[in-house]
A protein has these predicted regions:
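Alpha-helical subdomain
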Residues: 2-84, 93, 101, 156-223, ...
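Conserved Class I S-adenosyl-L-methionine-dependent methyltransferase catalytic core
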Residues: 18-33, 40, 68-195, 199-200, ...
Length: 503
């Protein structure tokens, strides 16, 4: 979960992936849980009666949905225990170190720095303290103390907790800042002396040295005299297209920073700081997100091609009419088009997103099979008995839970009687305490006033209500493939081989 102090090439790649996607979520989770009083409201494991989520929410004065989004992650991280009856208690090691007054005070002091960390770029350029919330903060000195000095903790578990609580988000914002300054791109071209880096990035002497020292601590850079470069491990990991993709990932994560800072407000009152139900916010956010998805189009294309091949095992795609709802980059619809040249694919999304999808479809020579349909996911009537296959590629997680029945009703109506609904989604286990990456993804959906992730049985119940009584859930790399149809329609029970193996 938290990044190691030094990394081999493979673990450095994993660490960078975590810092780009979930490190700030981890810090915000722990920071908010402490500020809510959630840890204090839980009985210690084995010393009291476990409490359910709704009772815990009432105890801390927060929404049930908000508290659940925190608790499911805390259980997965093994900081909170959940018994077979779904009762919750605080694990003994956590209860022990949170009783340490000095350690707890250190956590509370660290929690105050979130807003100031967001001004790191300004601090690097000026070399001076920055103003945040009417106060002056020496962010550069804070980074030096946080990463380059030893922070005492009463137990190894406490030190690990502090690392997640304080350093995870700080790592993310350091790399956001290094990306915005152009520092990482400068180092990617080869060793650079300090004067050249300052000239290229606009950094002050103090600011640049602080950033380079912390990057070195993370295993990314090395300095000899006045010359800095990527470490060999970092050079290998960030070679080719990896660095541009990483920078785009950090750009997406940066959009959540203020919302994570004010997460307590959202958990208590469901007051959403980054509200993707706001049309203007949504349009801007998803336009950027479609560009990010396009950056990993090749890997997503492998997944979607495998899904199309899986369905083709039991149902011919020849002449099929396919609707790709919330198409994003267009990768799922294109997979069906490329699997069967006679299939006709309709790509449905916001107009601003379809512009990028059209470019991708054209690039993969599937434009002749394509139709582009701009519209509103939340209200659109998709027709009646019009499609052999309807694809929902990571779309359901943007819908609030109360919106899912209507969505499934509209989709089921649009399916032909023997049609198949294809859902690509992060599906939770039946206890809703994993997988970890899925839970972090769901955490961000709550943060932005979107939807919940569900288990297979939860999806199956909703689909059965609209007549899609047959379901299977197959594991793809990174996500799940959920297929649904009416009774009597044959569904595949195992994945087709990966495209290369199939060839």
């Amino acid at each position: 979960m938290s990044a190691p102090q030094s990394a081999t090439p493979s673990s450095l790649a994993q660490s960078l992936h975590f810092w780009a996607r979930n490190a700030s979520n981890e810090s915000a989770l722990l920071r908010t849980s402490l500020r809510l009083g959630l840890f204090d409201a839980l009985p210690v494991e084995g010393e009291g009666t476990p409490v359910k989520v709704d009772a815990l929410a009432a105890k801390v004065g927060a929404s049930v949905r908000g508290v659940r989004s925190l608790v499911e992650l805390l259980v997965c991280l093994k900081l909170v225990h959940m018994d077979e009856a779904l009762g919750l208690s605080l694990t003994r090691p956590v209860a022990s170190f949170l009783k340490d007054a000095a350690f707890r005070q250190k956590l509370q002091e660290t929690a105050r720095w979130w807003g100031a960390i967001g001004h790191l770029e300004e601090a690097v350029k000026s070399g001076e303290p920055v103003t945040s919330e009417g106060q002056r903060w020496d962010v550069l000195e804070y980074y030096r103390e946080l990463f380059l000095e030893t922070v005492p903790g009463p137990t190894p578990e406490a030190k690990d907790f502090f690392d997640r609580f304080a350093r995870s988000a700080a790592r993310t914002w350091l790399l956001v800042t290094a990306g915005r300054l152009g520092l990482l791109e400068q180092l990617a071209t080869g060793p650079k002396d300090e004067a050249a880096l300052r000239a290229a990035t606009g950094a002050s002497e103090r600011g640049l040295r602080t950033v380079l020292e912390v990057l070195a601590h993370l295993g990314l850079t090395q300095t000899e005299g006045a010359t800095s470069s990527f470490t060999e491990e970092a050079r290998q990991v960030l070679d080719g297209k990896a660095l541009p993709y990483l920078l785009r990932s950090f750009s997406v994560s940066a959009q959540y920073w203020e919302a994570l800072d004010r997460l307590e407000e959202t958990v208590r009152h469901e007051r959403f700081i980054l509200d993707l139900k706001d049309p203007e916010v949504s349009q801007r956010f998803y336009a950027d997100n479609s560009n990010q998805i396009t950056a990993v189009f090749a890997s997503h294309f492998q997944l979607s091609r495998r899904a199309a091949a899986t369905i083709a095992q039991v149902r011919p795609l020849a002449g099929a009419s396919v609707l790709d709802i919330g198409t994003g980059s267009g990768v799922w619809g294109v997979a069906f088009a490329r699997t069967e040249p006679t299939a006709h694919v309709t790509y449905f999304d916001q107009e601003v997103v379809l512009a990028q999808a059209r470019r991708n479809v054209e690039q993969l020579k599937a434009l002749g099979q394509a139709r582009f349909w701009p519209g509103n996911l939340f209200t659109q009537d998709f027709g009646e008995a019009a499609y052999d296959f309807i694809i929902l590629p990571q779309v359901l997680n943007v819908l609030r839970p109360e919106s899912l029945p209507d969505m499934f009703r509209r989709v089921a109506r649009a399916l032909k009687p023997d049609g198949i609904l294809v859902i690509a989604e992060y599906v939770l286990n039946e206890r809703r305490d994993g997988p970890l990456d899925h839970l972090y993804f769901g955490f961000r959906r709550f943060l932005t006033n979107e939807g919940d992730l569900l288990s297979h049985s939860e999806y199956a119940a909703l689909l059965s209500d609209v007549g899609l009584t047959a379901t299977v859930c197959l594991p793809l790399p990174t996500q799940e493939l959920l297929l649904a149809a009416r009774s009597g329609v044959t569904l595949p029970t195992q994945l087709a081989p990966p495209p290369r193996a199939a060839a």
